């Protein structure tokens, strides 16, 4: 059966390239979009946080705020109103979504030189710590209350594109880099990793997904179009690999059922697609429908928890879309 395209329910265009989007945890029909714009004349990187009301399944822009360029953001599991943002200037910042059409700046934490890009971040389950991966190949863990760096590792030769806590054991942290390395750290063992795999991936590792229902299994994505399922107890050989036809920039967990884990795949130059990973992680089934309306570099996506309405955004065409996989 051939794949079929999906028509968007609503579309809007941001002022600057869009690279991350997530629905609010407080107002679940409000979508937050982050943007990144490099000013070629000054070489400065600018960003905006944009809020959309999607209540009627239509994108209605209700707020935007200037800031440094944004590469990633995540909601806190400790306080649903708090958003942590990774910037292009060596720092992370925190905002509160207390009112429907407004984000309020709380504080910033400087963790590196202003030339270093914060590429990815992830909260610990407690929400008390934040892991950050950076363009200089380093990965670190910040104590949020104090702003102190608790652990720092340098195991990647190039950009550390992504980092993700193990949801089976929060002492463990994974990172993926442009050097095609997948690395695991244990916070109880400072200064060195516990394993570093360069066999599984043949291009940059850009996404990692771990969830409590996964047990010891994780899913990863790479630039070179492949998604893998892995058993972290025997990391060198994938349980299953699938060519998804586009760089697997993000993997967003949607739900777990009796038979499978439902995941949204953000596939860079190919678009976005709903995926189903079998509960034993031995197979990946891609939906026969794929969202291809983004013209260039789909980098962000999320789903609305109330009804599953999907939102995605793309970089060069500055496009935000709402759509359904039905």
Swiss-Prot record:
Catalytic reactions of this protein: diphthine methyl ester-[translation elongation factor 2] + H2O = diphthine-[translation elongation factor 2] + methanol + H(+)
InterPro entries in the cross-refs: Apc4-like_WD40_dom, Diphthine_MTase, WD40/YVTN_repeat-like_dom_sf, WD40_repeat_dom_sf, WD40_rpt
EC numbers on record: 3.1.1.97
Function: Catalyzes the demethylation of diphthine methyl ester to form diphthine, an intermediate in diphthamide biosynthesis, a post-translational modification of histidine which occurs in translation elongation factor 2 (eft201 and eft202).
Transmembrane feature ranges: none
Protein family (similarity comment): Belongs to the DPH7 family.
Residue windows of the WD repeats: 65-105, 113-152, 155-195, 293-326
GO cellular component: cytoplasm; cytosol; nucleus
GO term, biological process aspect, one: protein histidyl modification to diphthamide
This protein's encoding gene: rrt2
Localization annotation: Cytoplasm; Nucleus
Name of the protein in its database record: Diphthine methyltransferase
One Pfam family recorded for the sequence: WD40
Keyword terms: Cytoplasm, Hydrolase, Nucleus, Repeat, WD repeat
Pathway: Protein modification; peptidyl-diphthamide biosynthesis
Molecular function terms from GO: diphthine methylesterase activity
EC class: hydrolase
Database matches in SMART domains: WD40
SUPFAM superfamilies hit by this protein: WD40 repeat-like
Gene3D superfamilies: YVTN repeat-like/Quinoprotein amine dehydrogenase
